Amino acid sequence: MIMGECQVTTETKTFEPKIAAFLCNWCSYAGADLAGVGRFQYPATIRTIRVPCSGRINPLYILKAMANGADGVLISGCHPGDCHYMSGNYVARRKFALIDSLLKYVGLEEGRVSFSWVSAAEGVRFAEVVKGVTERVTALGPNNGVFKVQDGGGTNE
Amino acid sequence: MKITKEKFGQSFDALAADYQIIAPVSDAGGVNYKAVKSFSEVKQDYLNSKLPPKSFLFPQHEKLLSYKKEGKDVTIKNELKVGKSILFGVRPCDAKAMLLLDKVFKNDEYTDPYYYERRDNSVIIGLACNKISPTCFCSSMSISPASSEGSDIFLIDLGDSYQVEVITEKGKALMAGLEELVELSAEEQALVDTIKSAQTASKVDVSTITAKLDKMFDSPFWDTLHEKCLSCNACSFACPTCHCFDISEEVHKNEGSRVRTWDACMAPLFTLHGSGHNPRDKKKARWRQRMMHKFNYFVHNNGDIACVGCGRCIKSCPVNLDIRQVIDGVNNVELVVD
Amino acid sequence: MVYLKYKTGGEQMSSIVDDIRATARQLLTDGKVDVVIGYEKGSLPLKATPCFVRSPQDIDKLIWDETCENNLAAFSTLTEGKKAIIAKGCDSRALVVLLQENQLVRDDLYIIGVSCQGVINKKKIEAETGEILEASIADGKVTVKGMVCDKEYTFTEVKDASCQTCRYPNPVLEDIHIGGSIDVPQQAAVFADVAEMENKTAGERQAYFQEQMSKCIRCYACRNACPLCYCKECFVDCNSPKWLTGGVDQAENLFFQAGRVLHLAGRCVECGACSRACPQDVDIRALNRKMSKDVFTMYKHESGISMDSNPALNEYSADDPEAFLVKE
């Protein structure tokens, strides 16, 4: 069924992934802002969700995004050492490493969920990261249903 | 009268064209009821399914209706889809359990269309138990390993043939196409008699439990009974008569659906009110409710005990809280006379 | 791997039971505790059941053998008053984590430590013998009369998977130790089972977990049997935000199991209570073991082995591995 959907989408139009991007308020969100102010082009695939700190990202956010049908998830925070709250991203880093490993273990494709550090000064780099992530998710195709809820009732946007 | 399994299988396969046939199959989770296309898929030698066949009539998670709002227009779609079905290989306990579910979902006051449409459109082919599990205690619950109550057609496995009993009109209609019933040999008749007279080894006494429970609401018996319970839903979900559910809305932007999901009295959330008040916030109250509902309230409301002795709750309980021991415990309570 | 100082069954075992009972009697008569949480004989063969002893006349119910598989630490947070708990190695590790997380008051807890040689996994036996009619354990042999066949097993054959890889059979925290202790050779944790799964292709793993998740009925026996799943409101029950719909779709089941495993990251003590509690025999352990392996290899942490070591996710280091970062 998932395969079927996938074929329909790719045959009728080019697949444009929907990517949920959780960005920390102090660095990556500002980086995205800088990319905008500086007019650095990047694909309009991400749906930005601003969080106070990468340490605030609950692992369930990532799972829920995919359950609701996101084709990819991007998570970005301050570079280690630069956290506005001193240690938020250090704590987050441990969580992210475990999440990433577990998701791959249960069979989620590499590249579906991406993590990066982007500072407020890295507008160009933010655009590059989004480009890279978009390319990878596009190559993977739509959410393959490892976590996508098929009949949750009305969540098929 | 009997029919060879070969002939029966041919009719079964032919019926699969018109009916959705639900039968026990062996899958990753053990023996369970699933839709099959051919008799060859049916698991032959099994004690009972791991999960009861009730989920066919009353699914664990069911979309009742869906809706969509566009401008000022709201469209509502009824999600009930029913076709003709056959439930094959239902054990006597589970067939009896369906009669009990009928009392809940179709009574004088209320008829649940989702349950009843499926119920009315399905034929139940019961199958006697040739082997009896040590946790079975149906003989104590006014049925037996070979009782045909609740079945439309009842079969007894004789090795390479089935002894056939047509119980209801529905069963008769289905059997109309089945020819070539032959008489049993003397040996087979003896086998049928043995199977029919079999009793479960495990027994409980429920003769006075309802009256006893009438007076036990405040008994100290409940104070310690629940202690080892983990409050999981394993017993309720494995029970062929448990029927509590929760209805929720799954809404996303301008569309959504109303879904019905199994709920279980063992979970603290079961009775949590919107106000935050929970009338059964303690395990003690929840265990009392479980016993009261099955052995007292249900009897008062519907005239029957809501337990059929299938033993699934005993097998699935992670802490071995055995309902047979709880029944014994209730029987042994000495009531304080005021 | 694990060398025993004493034999399974036999005299040693019965003297352990006697000592447990004597200790329980002493504690109750001295008024040191209100309740002793232990095991009594269950109603099914090869199954012990948790037992709450409050008065000396119930003390003789207490038993100790290879069927005592529940993790009693799960009851420690649910039972009020001062309590004594019979703790195996894994149970004591769970108690350590609970104490570290301030879920228990040390002074209200009396830990009766017993070294454990592993517990029997009934499901393993029943897969072959059918439902067990009768069984006995003697001299390291488990003799089973089943509905399909009769069989004799050595204890090692029917030991639960968690006990096969157990490195802490002796309680790590206890107020009294009963019976002998078990020699464990000093060696690093081995994760052969995880490695085997990791070596499969992503597609194979995906298919495996989808099959496992298709069995899950979301009864939450795993969560409730887990001593460390003590949240007042579990994320699966939360309705604002509503993480899950309550459906039994395999993707949602995986969401639940993966979410649970992530919450147990660096906390899981690998007692295997979740897998044994599962009425549907879902391989929950496969996920927990993976998490344990990652925590161990990345952060050199094993949960609950000492009161002094901080939980892995409560700490960080400037040079933690960053292999998960997106390749640019």
Predicted region positions:
Chain B
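Ferredoxin-type iron-sulfur electron-transfer modules in oxidoreductases and energy-metabolism complexes
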Residues: 206-227, 245-338
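Extended amphipathic alpha-helical segments enriched in small hydrophobics
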Residues: 226-236
